[in-house]
Regions:
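NAD(P)+-binding Rossmann beta1-loop-alpha1 motif at the extreme N-terminus of oxidoreductases
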Residues: 1-66, 91
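Rossmann-fold dinucleotide-binding core
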Residues: 7, 98-178, 182
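Beta-strand segments within the central parallel beta-sheet cores of soluble alpha/beta enzyme folds
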Residues: 11, 203-211, 262-266
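Hydrophobic beta-strand scaffold residues
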Residues: 30, 50, 117-119, 160, ...
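Rossmann-fold NAD(P) dinucleotide-binding segment
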Residues: 53-117
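Active-site-proximal catalytic alpha-helix in oxidoreductases
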Residues: 133, 137-140, 161, 167-198, ...
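Interdomain hinge/lid region at the active-site interface
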Residues: 171, 180, 215-279, 300
């Protein structure tokens, strides 16, 4: 890849910032944009370029959209200051948010009408893997979209799953992943706090269950947050009402019953209602603790 490959990352949260760092490390001429100016300045201190998005849009080879949801994605691409109409023909958009499959198909069609490739490219792996260029990307799009996006995929991903030649398949797979991930976090919290009622300490829970058949990646990643009493958000509680809501919308459209997903969603909604929405999603354990009068580590 020539060092002149030009990439903009829009959305410099915990995942997007890591994606931008990986693009920098991969030799891209990298721009970063966010609603929080300090995030832009921080990335610039690491080597990203300065510039207004509207001014540099026509020079980009790729735009990586790492925002919260479908509404923010659409606003970035086609809103009042929409990016896509300003991009040069043949450039590519990689859309990384968790969105409904039909939304991804619509964005692909709108981008294609303006000569822009669209890769449905939801990401997984957490902020550490984003920063180290080791994400898993569940991607779908035309062969030309994959080809145009290759330098970004090479810089940011350890594994790229090529799931089809049209947008939507990537987002469908991400929804399935989020079903499992959201349920696993909630059931980890349920199991840990049930154990506490029987005298099993959170520390011993993590030590033992992480080595047993009941473990999961989410248990091993999130349960230590509870043990440490550290709810600084790597992934917020507020993510899950949105993501599990997408899962249930897909299920409804398929006349598919998803009762376990629905039960997990309720726990996240209760957590958000308790004012925990901006805390790490491991804070769903506080719902269970409150219900039975338990004191979690680090609680006052």
């Amino acid at each position: 890849m020539p060092n002149s490959f030009r990439t903009a990352v829009i959305g410099l949260g915990s995942m997007g910032y890591g994606v931008a760092q990986s693009c920098l490390r991969g030799g891209h001429v990298t721009y970063g944009f966010d609603v929080v100016p300090s995030q832009i300045e921080r990335l610039q201190s690491e080597g990203s370029m300065k510039g207004d998005l509207a001014d540099i849009a026509g020079t980009l080879d790729a735009a990586v959209i790492v925002v919260l949801d479908a509404a923010q994605t659409e606003d970035v691409l086609f809103g009042k200051r929409g990016l896509v109409p300003l991009m040069r023909k043949g450039a590519v958009v990689l859309a990384c948010a968790t969105v409904p499959p039909n939304f991804a198909r619509t964005m692909e069609a709108r981008c294609s009408a303006l000569g822009i490739h669209y890769l449905d490219a939801p990401i997984s792996g957490g902020s550490a893997k984003a920063a180290s260029g080791q994400l898993s990307i569940m991607a779908s799009g035309t062969p030309d979209a994959f080809a145009a996006a290759a330098p970004v995929l090479d810089a940011t991903a350890e594994t790229v799953f090529e799931l089809g030649d049209a947008a939507g398949a990537g987002s469908a797979m991400k929804a399935v992943n989020q079903l499992l991930a959201g349920v696993h976090i909630a059931t980890m919290a349920e199991a840990m706090t049930l154990g506490m009622t029987q005298g099993v300490s959170p520390e011993k829970f993590v030590e033992v269950i992480s080595q047993c058949a009941g473990t999961s990646w989410m248990l091993e990643n999130r349960a230590p947050h509870i043990v440490a009493g550290d709810y600084a958000p790597l992934s917020q509680v507020n993510i899950w009402p949105k993501d599990l809501g997408i899962v249930l919308d897909i299920a409804k459209s398929a006349s598919f019953s998803a009762p376990i997903t629905a039960a997990a969603l309720q726990q996240y909604l209760v957590a958000a209602g308790m004012g925990l929405g901006r805390e790490d999603d491991a804070a769903v354990a506080k719902v269970y603790a409150r219900n039975v009068g338990l004191t979690l580590p680090g609680a006052a």
